From Swiss-Prot:
The gene is GSTP1. The modification N6-acetyllysine is found at K128. PROSITE patterns: GST_CTER, GST_NTER. Glutathione binds at Y8, R14, W39, K45, Q52, L53, Q65, S66. It comes from Macaca mulatta (Rhesus macaque). InterPro entries: Glutathione-S-Trfase_C-like (IPR010987), Glutathione-S-Trfase_C_sf (IPR036282), Glutathione_S-Trfase (IPR040079), Glutathione_S-Trfase_N (IPR004045), GST_C (IPR004046), GST_pi (IPR003082), GST_superfamily (IPR050213), Thioredoxin-like_sf (IPR036249). This is Glutathione S-transferase P.
Length: 210
């Protein structure tokens, strides 16, 4: 039985980066899909620490909060930089990803029709820091931090992919980010996962937007 279990709704949502990481690292995991009917019944929600999903199980360790999953696997699988300096930079990148993801989710779930145009107009300013970070690391030819992949790379990749769906061409002005997405997406195990029905057939969000 796989040591890892993902408990979540039938969406990519806040587990897409986690699944990318697991797939790319050659890990197996079990999915426990929660329907809205089951969730609205209430007993599962009441059992969750913060009253929300996703939930992640690593053996007898139960975790909540999607970024906690990534950091845990970063430590477990050696995806947290090669030293404390790189680990600090990985944390900084991941926090920046979370900031933009929260803005994206606010748009998707609360203001999509009225707010999309303004969001897309402001998007270059939100993406520029990641282009800058790439430019400062070996000319943008490797990863977002250092010379080995980290959990922040998977989170950033997912963020960029969903924004390419929201605003096609949004990376055209960012050559390093564009090349980064292409390079990471071409990693054999990750490429196979991104093309798999398990990924492709899931909506990005739970409300029909994207």
């Amino acid at each position: 039985m796989p040591p890892y279990t993902v408990v979540y709704f039938p969406v990519r949502g806040r587990c897409a980066a986690l699944r990318m990481l697991l797939a790319d690292q050659g890990q197996s995991w079990k999915e426990e899909v929660v329907t809205m009917e089951t969730w609205q019944e209430g007993s599962l929600k009441a059992s969750c620490l913060y009253g929300q999903l996703p939930k992640f199980q690593d053996g007898d360790l139960t975790l909540y909060q999607s970024n906690t999953f990534l950091r845990h696997l970063g430590r477990t699988l050696g995806l947290y930089g090669k030293d404390q300096r790189e680990a600090a930079l990985v944390d900084m990148v991941n926090d920046g990803v979370e900031d933009l993801r929260c803005k994206y989710l606010s748009l998707i779930y609360t203001n999509y029709e009225a707010g999309k145009d303004d969001y897309v107009k402001a998007l270059p300013g939100q993406l520029k820091p990641f282009e800058t970070l790439l430019s400062q690391n070996q000319g943008g030819k490797t990863f977002i931090v250092g010379d080995q992949i980290s959990f922040a790379d998977y989170n950033l990749l997912d963020l960029l992919l969903i924004h390419e769906v929201l605003a096609p061409g949004c990376l055209d002005a960012f050559p390093l980010l564009s090349a980064y997405v292409a390079r990471l997406s071409a990693r054999p195990k990750l490429k196979a996962f991104l093309a798999s029905p398990e990924h492709v057939n899931l909506p990005i969000n739970g409300n029909g937007k994207q």
